[in-house]
């Protein structure tokens, strides 16, 4: 039976930071389940904007691992990783507030779904890389997007598949 003493268990900040970094990059499955206090916020935003709950949860899981206090290296904040300018345009005054962040992030996701005719991969690419970048590709369907995916940043290419994988675990 394995019974380590306290001296053999690492608690260094670098080890914790490394795991956190891997989780944030999506290289380790966080196994995240939706904190119950977010469930009603997600259900409300889903009903308000017509975005499936499973997609909202998948974006949150991919973006922040359900950590409302996370900040990306680019400065995106909160559960759905809103940039300050985008957040302000969506009426979000505090991106760390889960209610505001989920409402604003879902509204933004809904706008991308509308802009790109309900094409989920295109909307996700726009959510991650910006709608202008996706529009500049001159494609009008997810199938066409996939044929020119290499023209998007590698982060965005990976983002689409990460969200789709996460969504499958949140579907009922």
Report each predicted region and the residues it spans.
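Cell-wall glycan-active module
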Residues: 1-58, 171-172
